């Protein structure tokens, strides 16, 4: 079996549309952050959903960095590439970030009620992941010899605990519940599909001998989410890419054929375009193209693909706007 790792990325170009320019009169959304123990020269605010919402500040210990912006929809702001903060239109949110080695502690969460509730929930989810020592990098799991059986069991436990946290949370919007669920599912289901194959490649233990049951049935019952909030999660969309190749590999096996993973950009585009439809196809292809452009190699190859995508599959005008911006 061939190993394929879809790298998680939260660069701005990995965005799915939930953000449009705000209409006149709509309240601005405000984020303020104070950092302690941060060693970088600059503090960066980068929106996961759009490259058009971002800001940077010179880093000074304890200084309040304030950014007000327009958005009509829910977004996730990434601070210094590590800390995710959830914001909706008109929210005001303040947090303190304390850097201790590789860990970032979020404290003093204050602001509008919805923003406080949403970000308390997000931090509770992060705490669960930390306490479980649930790693985001699958290659690191293989290096530590975490068995696929353990990873899959831990993934199921994580999803259950996150669902329980969401049920218990008060004053949270459907959007934050959906986003957190989709992001968690992205990590969990990617582990189901990818980790047994990666572990077999790294540790030379065939999938059939990993005591995980029938690999071909690990994703039974899965139905891709089609809502905009779920498709705005890079983690979830990465998983959807892997799901396409997983299903096509299983189909090839059932037909007695050998599946060849599409390693080339153009081949991946073609396979994903055939597998999905509607909003899911639009989001997946958009992310694939953004990822390729951000890679910075042979970017001119994207021209023909972008034209094909716009002509045949693009429904979301914002995606086209971002691609045009990236190609300038």
Residue ranges and their predicted role:
Residues 1-30:
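Bacterial Sec-dependent N-terminal signal peptides
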Residues 10, 34, 45-50, 215-218, ...:
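Generic detector of bulky aromatic hydrophobic side chains
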Residues 15-17, 41, 47-48, 55, ...:
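Generic signature of intrinsically disordered, low-complexity segments enriched in small/polar residues
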Residues 21-22, 45, 196:
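Short linear functional motifs in flexible/disordered or boundary regions
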Residues 25-172:
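A non-transmembrane, solvent-exposed segment enriched in polar/low-complexity residues
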Residues 106-328:
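Oxidative protein folding and maturation machinery
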């Amino acid at each position: 079996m061939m190993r394929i790792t879809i790298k998680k990325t939260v660069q701005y170009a990995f965005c799915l549309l939930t953000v449009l320019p705000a209409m006149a009169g709509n309240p601005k959304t405000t984020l303020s952050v104070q950092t302690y123990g941060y060693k970088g020269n600059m503090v960066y605010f980068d929106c996961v959903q759009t490259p058009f919402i971002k800001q940077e500040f010179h880093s000074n210990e304890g200084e309040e960095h304030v950014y007000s912006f327009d958005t009509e929809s829910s977004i996730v702001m990434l601070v210094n590439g590590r800390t995710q903060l959830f914001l909706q239109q008109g929210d005001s949110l303040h947090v303190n970030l304390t850097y201790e080695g590789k860990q970032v502690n979020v404290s003093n969460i204050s602001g509008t009620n919805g923003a406080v509730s949403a970000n308390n929930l997000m931090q509770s989810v992060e705490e669960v992941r930390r306490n479980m020592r649930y790693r985001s990098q699958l290659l690191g799991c293989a290096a530590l010899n975490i068995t696929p059986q353990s990873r899959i069991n831990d993934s199921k436990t994580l999803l259950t605990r996150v669902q329980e946290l969401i049920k218990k949370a008060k004053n949270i919007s459907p959007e934050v519940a959906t986003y957190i669920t989709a992001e968690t599912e992205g990590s969990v289901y990617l582990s189901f599909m990818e980790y047994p194959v990666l572990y077999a490649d790294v540790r030379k233990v065939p999938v059939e001998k990993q005591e995980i049951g029938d690999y071909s049935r690990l994703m039974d019952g899965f139905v891709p989410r089609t809502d905009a909030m779920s498709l705005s999660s890079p983690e979830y969309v990465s998983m959807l890419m892997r799901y396409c190749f997983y299903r096509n590999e299983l189909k090839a096996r059932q037909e007695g054929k050998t599946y060849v993973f599409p390693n080339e950009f153009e081949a991946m585009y073609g396979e994903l375009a055939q597998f999905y439809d509607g909003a899911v196809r639009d989001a997946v292809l958009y992310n694939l193209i953004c990822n390729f452009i951000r890679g910075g190699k042979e970017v001119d190859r994207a021209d023909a693909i972008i034209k094909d995508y716009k002509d045949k599959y693009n429904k979301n005008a914002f995606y086209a706007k971002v691609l045009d911006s990236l190609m300038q």
